[in-house]
Amino acid sequence: MGDRHTIQQNLNGLLSKLNDPDPDMRYMSLNDLYGILSNPCSSYLAHDQASATRLAEGLLKALDDQHGDVQNQALKCLGPLVARLPLEGLRTLLERLSNLTTSQTIDTSVPNTALRVIVTALPRPQPNQAPSPDANMAYSAVSEVLIPRLIGPGPHKRRGSVTKGMLEKDPAKGFSSDAIDVLIQVASCFGALLQESELTALEKAVMSIIDNDTAGTVVTKRALAAISALVVYFSDEQFGILVSELVERFNSPQLSTVHRRHLIAAVGCLARTVPAKFGPHLSTLAPFIFSAVGEDNLEVSHVLHYLCTSASNVYSSRNKPKIYHQYRQLPKEKLITGM
């Protein structure tokens, strides 16, 4: 109890110094706070909701500091803090940070970065092992709070709602590549626990970005990376549905040149990331890629390479699908060498 009492006194003192007008003092206080949170003696905070809440409030305030060094040190403290937070405290922190990502008055890259730090620091499922109770608890908070905020309210809930999904287009700022990076981190850390409905909803939110001709190059590339992170956890049935949706998009009479380029890039991501899942769908998607050959588009050449690499990996030399042999017969100046 003596150690706990001393630590609590130190924490209270450090939290009060976060209001000091001297940024150096605020930085040093956060540095000391990081040391305490990293010490096993502070593990009692997991059972002290009031103290954990005060710490979270102090760090949230420090994230809005005008000095970058102070902000960065506050971000550093979030990692060890989430290991000490009770479930309700974790939910509250995720909710607060998620709401800040759609603010019109602050630099929203900071709360997005904070969310990535938290997701990375949470206990996660390990390969070939049953998820631990801590990993299940962490996933429940991510599932209940963060994923709905990424996606936004469904159509039946949107009427009268002022809450915008983090992945939705902001009228003033456009799409957020930072929010996409949060999704990628969620998929990387908790993909094995994501429900099919969550995977589908996240995929649809990302595809709405890929479908948008006004999405910039950086945002589109991050959206493609997000699709790659998600499809690893798709069932064969889910993957088949995604392929069918891509075919519908390719066949749309309103398909623009930019949109088709984005879709071709998405096909390349699928072929590169999950070649075994992609193999059975080669003959379905290949014609859309071949139709773009000769348009002086390097992306098409890359995608053809991935398609045929997938064919080479999935099929035996005698049973390679028609696309593989079509690829080999195309003029070399249209292609990437190495096949």
From Swiss-Prot:
Source organism superkingdom: Eukaryota
GO cellular component, one term: nucleus
UniProt-annotated location(s): Nucleus
GO biological process: SCF complex assembly; sexual sporulation resulting in formation of a cellular spore; sporocarp development involved in sexual reproduction
HEAT repeat locations: 5-42, 50-87
Keywords assigned by UniProt, alphabetized: Nucleus, Repeat, Ubl conjugation pathway
Phenotypic effect of disruption: Cells show a dark red color when grown on an air-medium interface that induces development. Cells are able to initiate the cycle but are blocked in the initial stage of early nest formation. Cells exhibit reduction in asexual development and block in sexual development.
Gene3D superfamilies to which the protein is assigned, alphabetical: Leucine-rich Repeat Variant
Quaternary assembly: Interacts with candA-C. Interacts with unneddylated cullins culA and culD; interaction occurs only when complexed with candA-C.
Function: Assembly factor of SCF (SKP1-CUL1-F-box protein) E3 ubiquitin ligase complexes that promotes the exchange of the substrate-recognition F-box subunit in SCF complexes, thereby playing a key role in the cellular repertoire of SCF complexes. Acts as a F-box protein exchange factor when interacting with candA-C.
Note: In E.nidulans, CAND1 is separated into 2 distinct proteins: candA-N and candA-C (AC Q5BAH2), corresponding to the N- and C-termini respectively of the protein in other species.
PANTHER family per the UniProt record, alphabetical: TIP120 (PTHR12696)
Name of the featured protein: Cullin-associated NEDD8-dissociated protein 1, N-terminal part
Taxonomic placement: Eukaryota, Fungi, Dikarya, Ascomycota, Pezizomycotina
